[in-house]
Regions:
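Alpha-helical transition-metal enzyme core signature, strongest for iron centers
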Residues: 86-89, 136, 140-143, 147, ...
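Long, amphipathic alpha-helical stalk/connector segments used for oligomerization, subunit docking
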Residues: 311-397, 403
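Glycine-rich cofactor-pocket loops
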Residues: 148-170, 280-296, 329-336, 361-381
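Short beta-alpha connecting loops at secondary-structure transitions
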Residues: 28-32, 77-79, 287-307, 329-344, ...
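A short, charged helix-loop
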Residues: 225-242
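Active/binding-pocket-proximal capping segment
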Residues: 280, 403-410
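A conserved active-site cap/scaffold subdomain adjacent to cofactor or substrate pockets
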Residues: 243-278, 287-348
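A helix-coil-helix interface module used to build multimeric assemblies
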Residues: 2-207, 213-228, 289-290, 300-304, ...
Length: 485
């Protein structure tokens, strides 16, 4: 087929946006047919080696023949065979046997389809989780850098998206960071607990191996541990039906959903801050925000994070429902759903983390805008301190509290109804009950006096939690994201 024909075919078929627009080539390869079927062959080799080492009549020559064709998969032979037998595993057993005539008779010996299918799924999920882990650690590293840089920048905090006691930009970043750190804990736990299915037969009883090994229970007990070791795992699940428990997929996708929730919260905050013109995500010189409104600088990357995150959070329902509805030792209604939900969950979270890396690395902070908004609200925040100063000057606390309430309401009406600046300080200075000058009041208008321990909390969190985490993972730091659109 010519390149023009290939291009034409690609334009008249549906192509998943996850592959075309969002996920990295690295993650796409993990879920590619090439990766899948190479892993099948590695598993068949591991099984043959195990069976030989445990006494079955399998030769070194047969195993070497299998190894020599582990990576050159004859896809077309398998595809044509599947048209005849309607079974993907047996099609690839046949194709492998075509390349390995001496080993043909011992390929897949004693195994079921789930031996290659399910073990491969776990191997691929483990590899995909490692890639997610790498990117997640780098997102945390970028947020740590941002928090350190901005730890002393006072900013108006919001509760209910209404002005609240000030914090710092860096302290706010630690809130995003802590959620990603929690996700990393969950990921490492689930990744560390993954085991292989092993080779347990059609209903998990290893009946076929009783026949192969003449009922030798001690020998059969060695099969799964040996396969696990050859494939780089510590163990196999001790019991199973035909498949590994679909609860495993639920745990894995719940980790992805947790990351998606953290990313969504982060992206929402950036979108709101960009509306306030306090912080912006990166915006290229040639980037277009709107086809009609040329002045627009839309937070489209943060919006895309939110969009993909919703997909991942909903996608996590799929394995949960699949796990809940499996009958007895296995039903096949897991298969089609699993082929979609697991890869697409990983491809989407990969795109999300690339976007997070890109956004955090290029965040633009506008201190003057932040200061202007903070100073417009600070007189309200400072009223308690003002009242204390007035009491020291001889005032009555209860009377002063009522006067501040009344003057605050008046200043609020001036802002909301008349569009004026906040003149609360002027109103207080003009009220003889306070016995304070405007100069006295303006001395209290120092934002750093109202941020509490925000800066110190950033220092402590970075020192005690984040820097040890990054030191532990220093070999995977330095990843930069590339986004396609």
């Amino acid at each position: 087929m010519s390149k023009d024909e290939e291009k034409e075919m690609s334009n008249d078929r549906y192509v998943s946006p996850l592959s075309e627009r969002y996920a990295s080539r690295e993650m796409q390869y993990i879920f590619s047919p090439d990766k899948k079927f190479r892993t099948w062959r590695r598993l068949w080799i591991a099984l043959a080696e195990t069976e030989k080492e445990l006494g079955l009549n399998i030769t070194d020559e047969q195993i070497e023949e299998m190894k020599s064709h582990a990576d050159d998969i004859n896809f077309e032979v398998a595809k044509e065979r599947e048209k005849v037998v309607r079974h993907d595993v047996m099609s690839h057993v046949y194709a492998y046997g075509v390349q390995c005539p001496k080993a043909k008779g011992i390929i897949h010996l004693g195994a079921t389809s789930c031996y290659v299918g399910d073990n491969t799924d776990i191997i691929i999920m483990a590899e995909a989780l490692k890639l997610v882990r790498t990117k997640l650690v780098n997102v945390i590293a970028e947020l740590a850098k941002f928090a350190e840089e901005q730890k002393n920048q006072p900013t108006l905090a919001f509760t209910h998206f209404q002005p609240a006691q000030p914090t710092t930009v860096g302290k706010r970043a630690t809130l995003w960071m802590q959620e990603f750190e929690m996700d990393l804990e969950d990921l490492e736990y689930v990744l560390g607990s993954l085991k292989l299915l092993g080779s347990k037969g059609t209903t998990g009883t290893q009946a076929s191996f009783l026949e192969l090994f003449d009922g030798d229970q001690e020998t059969i007990d060695k099969i799964d541990p040996m396969i696990a070791e050859k494939m780089g795992f510590k163990a196999c699940y001790p019991v199973s039906g035909q498949t590994y428990s679909r609860k495993v997929d639920t745990r894995v996708l719940n980790v992805l959903a947790g990351i998606a929730a953290s990313a969504h919260k982060f992206s929402n905050d950036i979108r709101l801050l960009q509306h306030l013109k306090e912080i912006e995500e990166p915006f290229e010189k040639t980037q277009i925000g709107s086809s009609a409104m040329a002045y627009k600088r839309n937070p489209m990357r943060s919006e895309r994070i939110a969009s993909l995150s919703r997909y991942v959070m909903i996608d996590a329902l799929n394995p949960a429902i699949t796990s809940a509805t499996q009958w007895f030792e296995r039903t096949l209604d897991d298969s089609a759903n699993k082929r979609l939900s697991v890869p697409e969950g990983f491809l989407a979270i990969d795109g999300i983390l690339d976007l997070c890396l890109n956004v955090v690395d290029g965040l633009v902070v506008y201190p003057k805008v932040i200061e202007k908004r903070l100073m417009s609200e600070l007189p309200f925040m400072a009223t308690e301190n003002i009242m204390m100063d007035a009491v020291k000057a001889g005032g009555d606390r209860q009377e002063l509290h009522e006067r501040i309430r009344e003057l605050s309401m008046e200043a609020g009406r001036n802002v909301k109804e008349k569009g004026l600046d906040n003149n609360l300080l002027e109103l207080i200075a003009a009220d003889p009950a306070f016995n304070l000058t405007l100069e006295d009041l303006q001395k209290t208008m120092k934002p750093e006096k109202y941020v509490g321990r925000a800066s110190e909390q950033v220092d402590a969190y970075l020192k005690n939690v984040i820097r040890p985490l990054l030191e532990k993972n220093k070999e995977i730091l330095g990843v930069k994201a590339e986004i396609n659109v």
